[in-house]
């Protein structure tokens, strides 16, 4: 089976493959970040979002993979074979988990649309010949903040008074009128 773990989120393995392998933080750093930012939601029995669910699954799978590789490494007599197993897990599986963890943490932090926009813009940048592209790659945290998804249930605070309110009417007078209507 050819399963793309990013498909339901609007991305693809190919889109993430444009980012160099050294772009992604270590699994340990990503796990620490996930724990610091989203521990309560990840440990909650409630469903928060598909990104939380995917992150939860990735963390559990990583733990199982480490347990398995530790067991295999401890049971291999040949040091060369042991080193090959450790190297394979760190290189191949480690990169996949680093990509997966980074994607879901970034989507929760910046919003899915912003992350997809970043991946597309980075992909365009990296495929453009060096002579024709800007010297610096796009940076996720500097993309426009208009695409960041706000939490449900909270409306942004107004910075200006409502246009319906007449400025000439004093607050005291309005209170008096409202008291009269209540009686």
From Swiss-Prot:
GO terms for biological process: microtubule-dependent intracellular transport of viral material towards nucleus; symbiont entry into host cell; viral penetration into host nucleus. SUPFAM superfamilies: Hepatitis B viral capsid (hbcag) (SSF47852). Residues 155-177 are annotated as: 3 X 8 AA repeats of S-P-R-R-R-[PR]-[ST]-Q. Residues 177-183 are annotated as: RNA binding. Phosphorylated by host SRPK1, SRPK2, and maybe protein kinase C or GAPDH. Phosphorylation is critical for pregenomic RNA packaging. Protein kinase C phosphorylation is stimulated by HBx protein and may play a role in transport of the viral genome to the nucleus at the late step during the viral replication cycle. Residues 149-176 have a biased composition (Basic residues). The keyword Disulfide bond does not apply. Residues 136-183 are annotated as: Disordered. Keywords: Capsid protein, Cytoplasmic inwards viral transport, DNA-binding, Host cytoplasm, Host-virus interaction, Microtubular inwards viral transport, Phosphoprotein, Repeat, RNA-binding, T=4 icosahedral capsid protein, Viral penetration into host nucleus, Virion, Virus entry into host cell. Signal peptide: none annotated. A motif (Bipartite nuclear localization signal) lies at residues 158-175. GO terms for molecular function: DNA binding; RNA binding; structural molecule activity. The modification Phosphoserine is found at residues 155, 162, 170. It is found in: Virion; Host cytoplasm. GO terms for cellular component: host cell; host cell cytoplasm; T=4 icosahedral viral capsid. Sequence repeats lie at residues 155-161, 162-169, 170-177. Self assembles to form an icosahedral capsid. Most capsids appear to be large particles with an icosahedral symmetry of T=4 and consist of 240 copies of capsid protein, though a fraction forms smaller T=3 particles consisting of 180 capsid proteins. Entering capsids are transported along microtubules to the nucleus. Phosphorylation of the capsid is thought to induce exposure of nuclear localization signal in the C-terminal portion of the capsid protein that allows binding to the nuclear pore complex via the importin (karyopherin-) alpha and beta. Homodimerizes, then multimerizes. Interacts with cytosol exposed regions of viral L glycoprotein present in the reticulum-to-Golgi compartment. Interacts with human FLNB. Phosphorylated form interacts with host importin alpha; this interaction depends on the exposure of the NLS, which itself depends upon genome maturation and/or phosphorylation of the capsid protein. Interacts with host NUP153. Belongs to the orthohepadnavirus core antigen family. This is Capsid protein. It comes from Hepatitis B virus genotype D (isolate France/alpha1/1989) (HBV-D). The lineage of its organism: Viruses, Riboviria, Pararnavirae, Artverviricota, Revtraviricetes. The gene is C.
């Amino acid at each position: 089976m050819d399963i793309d773990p990013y498909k339901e989120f609007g991305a693809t393995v190919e889109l993430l493959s444009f980012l160099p392998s050294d772009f992604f933080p270590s699994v340990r750093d990503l796990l620490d970040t996930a724990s610091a930012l989203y521990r309560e939601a990840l440990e909650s029995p409630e469903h928060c979002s598909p990104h939380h669910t995917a992150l939860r699954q990735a963390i559990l799978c990583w733990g199982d993979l480490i347990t398995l590789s530790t067991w295999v490494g401890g049971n291999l007599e040949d040091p060369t074979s042991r080193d090959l197993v450790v190297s394979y897990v760190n290189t191949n599986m480690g990169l996949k988990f680093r990509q997966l963890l980074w994607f879901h943490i970034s989507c929760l932090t910046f919003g899915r649309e912003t992350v997809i926009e970043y991946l597309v813009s980075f992909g365009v940048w990296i495929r453009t010949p060096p002579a024709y592209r800007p010297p610096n790659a796009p940076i996720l945290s500097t993309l426009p903040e208009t695409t960041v998804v706000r939490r449900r249930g909270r409306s942004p605070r107004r910075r200006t008074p409502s246009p319906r309110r007449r400025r000439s009417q004093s607050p005291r007078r309005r209170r008096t009128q409202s008291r009269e209507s209540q009686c």
